[in-house]
Structure formats: structure tokens, C-alpha cells
Amino acid sequence: MITLLIIMLLMSLFNMSKTPEAKGPVTYLQYSRSEMRYRVEYVFKRAENGDCTLTKIEGYQDETGQTIVVPASVADKLWEMVEEHKMRKYKSSYTPKMRVLDGYMWKLQAEFAKGERLYTGGDNEMPDGGIGIKQLVNYLAWLWDKQNVPPIREMVYRVDGMVAYPLHYYKLEKDYSNDCYIFTNASNCRYDEARSAQVPNAFADEIRQIVKEESMFDYAPDYQPEYEVLDGRSWRINLRFEGTKSTISSSGREAYPAGEGLRRIEQLCYEKWKELEPQSKPAPLQSPYE
């Protein structure tokens, strides 16, 4: 009995002497990547009162960057990714066997609620093929793009019904040579009967504003109705942006995302096309069903 008590006492002392395991949320996180002609850095901070900010520094001339306010839940989301990919076990340095002169360098450091810190970096090589770090960086970029909405590179909005042609089809694509956009309409006609016209950049900026106001970066990939509707409509929207991998890709049948984002874009495109139609030109499209 005495022996058992001694063992239990020793185990208790051993557990008390162990370093407390780090717990979320993340209170500070900095990621940077440098290449020959490009540099990007994200800095996340969580204040003692729980307020969170994200700063993006881009290019070699930018020293202070821009800062936005982000939800407090971001701190927990970052912690989840750190734990999921076991980032606290990353080595302090990763360097490939062969030197790459025109490659890249990266650095990641973070602090957690109980004071533990993470520091890691590398030269043209990342742990686990970079899966964890890329997921984390893509999330930070998505947060940034959600609030700032980069210039649109391409948009396709389509609504289909029970007929052989689209009820609505609007495509907006950047024309770099003329510093404008090509606006294509194939609504209520066959795809090979589509027409297009040039529109100024300001039109794309109006769509960007709708994307921001309606929080369209939060759109889920798929929306399905609670009950099947045999003669219902289906819709799809795809948006790509300049200088980022962030995209918006969403579709549904009858059910729509919260808000008025899709309807506002549809109405804006409809009104704009009424102005452009007299000057439009044939622009046959390939049917997505062929």
C-alpha cells in the first residue's frame, strides 16, 4: 500500500514538471516568401482583448503594407491548421541538396496562447511537400481577398432551365491589349449565336463591389433545394481574379446563397447589355454540353 502511494506521488510530481502543452488560439503569425522579383508577407496579430488584424506586405518597395480587421475565429482556424499538419514539429530550417539560384526563400513564425513559439524556414524546400504551409497561406490570401476583392480577370454567370439554350449567360473577360473587358452574352439563344462588345473597367469594378458587399467569397460550392423541383433552374458562377489563386466557384439548383449577390449581378449585366447590344458583334461560344 505504501509502495503504491509512493508511485502515485512520483507520477503526480512528474506530470506537474512537464511543460504545458501549447494550446490555441494563435496570437501571432508571420509568413514571408521572397523570390528574385517578388515578395509577399502576411502578419496576423491577436490583441489581448481578442481583436484580430491581418497585414499584407507585397513587393520589395512596400515596407508597412495594408492592415484589415478579421474575425476572432481566425485565430482558432490558424491553430487548427497548425495542429492538423503538426507544424510545431517542423525543423527550424529546410534546405535542398542542390542550390537553386533563381528559387525562393520562405519563413514562418508563430506564437500561441500559452507562450510557445514556432519558427521554421527554408530555401526552395518545404516540409511535407509544403501541403500544410500552402493551405495556411491560401487561407490568409482568401481572407485578404474577401475584404479587398482584387480586380476581376474573368467571370462567367449562367442560368439554365428546361430548354436547349441558357436562360442567362454572361461572360466578362479582361482584354489586356485594349485595357478594357470583353462582355459576351448568350442569353436566350444558342451558344453559337452569342454576341460580345467591349466595356470599360468601371463595369468590372461594379461587379467587384457587389462581390464585396454580398460577401460572395463565403459562397459554398454547391446549393441544393430541400425538395426536388423537376422544372427548376440551375445556376453557376465562376470568378477569377488578378494576382491571386483565390476564386469563387459556386452552383445550385433552385436554392440560392443568402443575400442578393447573384440577382444583383444578373440585373447589372442585363441592363448593361441593353446599352451594348446595338454595337455588339458575333462571338460564337462552344457549348459546355458538347
Predicted regions located by residue number:
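Bacterial Sec-dependent signal peptides at the C-terminal "C-region" and cleavage site
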Residues: 2-24
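Charged, low-complexity intrinsically disordered regulatory segments in eukaryotic signaling
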Residues: 5, 35-39
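Short, flexible N-terminal segments of the mature chain
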Residues: 41-63, 168-192
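A short-motif feature that recognizes glycine-rich, charge-decorated loops
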Residues: 54-90, 184-219
